[in-house]
Every structure is written in structure tokens, then in C-alpha cells.
Amino acid sequence: MKSLIFGYGQTGKSFENYLKNKNLSFDIYDDDKSKLPGVHQEKDITPSFNNLKDYQDIYISPGVKLENYLTKKEISNLNLKSDLDIFFLEHNSFKIGITGTNGKSTLAYLLEQALNHSSSAIALGNIGNPVLENLNHQNKYSVIEVSSYQLDKMENNLFDLSIITNIEPDHIKFHGTFQKYKEAKLKICRDHIKTIFCEGHDYENIATRIAQDLEPNSSYENLIFSLLPHRLEEFSGRFIDDSKSTNSSSLRHALSKLKFSGVLIMCGDPDKECLSEINIKGPNRVYIFGKHREDLVKIVKHQNIKDFATLDEVLDDLKNLNDSSKILFSP
């Protein structure tokens, strides 16, 4: 019997490579047919239960919300597989899962460095390195950044160690409520898995302490960390790139940490967090751009706001500034 890959983003493509390597037959479905390889564009697959029930396995991408297509009972009668569940069964490394609303990418990046200082590790998952593309890696540790979307699809929790950086409202549009978002996040500590709940934002210290616990016979005195790209990264003297920021709590942290008083550039969909108001304190100007700019202008509270259709328009306007204010890009 054939299998189906449901969703053709980065994870969907890793499913494709995985199934090809096993010489298994499969179809691919995505709401956007233009993304699919040519042979799969020709197939007319409607995501109804009658069409899906005949597939042996359905490899489900994290961002797919099956409830938009099927009832809960219908979903329960399908054989769903996530990339995490496959990796748990097919790789024998020590698996560290890291999740949280903010800081998970930073901590995964730093913990990978700390463990490579004393042993061998690779950062995988939501950090941009799909787990299924790394089934053959030989490192002792897999440091896996996982989103609420991925945890929502995970059937069995087989992490050896779980870490939660923090939980604040986010992705409410996908999960429906903050409570359901929290429940998805907390799946990472289900089944009596040892879990670390982080306190504060000193992720270099947290990463070092975790590495010391795992590799107690190693010294970390000479460890020098490199920082995660696009996370409060300064360049050209006045620009600060915080484009890894994806929610309002991350923005608040950046403004607080920097004690920022320059120009803030922001964009995004406020419905993602069900936001009704964003108070911006510190910057002397706020530039808002993108397709959701009108929605953001309504809820951002600041005395000096300008909105633009595109980032290019923002950059053109910045050329007219007569001062040397720092510019924070935190979309």
C-alpha cells in the first residue's frame, strides 16, 4: 500500500527523501499544488477521510491542522507518523528536546557548542536542520529544538532529557486557546521524562550547567560561545538584526535587554497571538510594514508610528533620517 506525505514544506521534503531511501511508494498532498513535484501535481487528492483511509501511513507535517479537514474520530482511525516519532525509533543518540515560546533556538545552539566542547553533538529540528535528514549522524547527542506544532504531532515522548525555556501566549491562531498551546508544549515532559525548567535568560550559563551534568568529567572554563545569527546581531555600526524574533514577548525582551531608544522596525500577524494591544516603550520611532500593517497599526501603542507596504519602502525612508539612531529589526 502507498503512504501519503501531508504537507510539503521542509519537513514534508525530508519525509520524501526518507521514503525514497527506503524505496517506498507515496503520494504527496499540499494545499498549494504549485509547490509539489511535477508528477504529484497531476494527482487529484482531496483530504477527506474516504481518500485518506486507504493509505498505509500518513506522514504529517507540523504545520498541518487535520481538524480543518476531518473529525477527531476520523483522525483517530488514521495511521499518522511524525518526523520525531520516526527519529526516536531509528536513531540511538541521547536525545535532548528543547521547547519554549522564546529562547529555544538560542539554547539549542549554545548547548550544541557546550556538548561539542566535551563530547559530540548536533543541533536538529526547528533550528533548521530536519531530524530525518540526519538519521545517519554519529554524534553522541541530538539537541532537538521542537515547536508546539511538532509536539502536537508527536505520538510518543522518547526524549532522554527535556528542557522548557518558558511558556507565554503564542500560536493561538493554530492551537485555538492558550491552554491548548500550553498542553502541546508540555507534551515534552510527558511520560516521566526528566525535564529542566529554565529560570531567566542567561542561556550560556544554562547550557554550560546542562553540559556539565551530562559530561561531568570535562572542564568548561575555556569555552567561548558564538552567538546565534539574527538574534540581536549588530552590523554596520547602527543596525541590530533580531529577525529570529517571532512574537511580542521576544520583542519585549529585546527592548528591555538593549534599553533601546532608536528606530524599531516590526511586522507580523497579531492574530497569531490573539493580541489586542502592544505597548511599545523605549524606541523614538516605530516603523510597521507588511500585509498585516493595518492590523498592527490599530493595536500598537506608540506616539510616533509610520507604516509601509514593503521593507524596501522602510529602508528608503530610513535614508532620510538626520540622526544616528540605532535601528532594531525585530519582526
Regions found by a protein language model. Give the residues of each.
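Short, basic phosphate-binding NTP loop
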Residues: 1-97, 229-231, 298-300, 308-319
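Nucleotide phosphate-binding/pyrophosphate-handling subdomain across enzymes
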Residues: 14-18, 120-121, 203-285
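Residue-level signal for inorganic ion chemistry
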Residues: 19, 58, 98, 126, ...
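Short beta-strand "acidic-cap" motif of Rossmann-like dinucleotide-binding folds
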Residues: 26-30, 122-123, 143
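Short internal beta-strands
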Residues: 27-31, 197-199, 265-267, 282-293
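C-terminal helical cap/extension that packs against the catalytic core
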Residues: 38-39, 270-326
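Walker A (P-loop) phosphate-binding motif
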Residues: 83-127
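Flexible active-site lid/hinge loop adjacent to a nucleotide/diphosphate
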Residues: 138-202
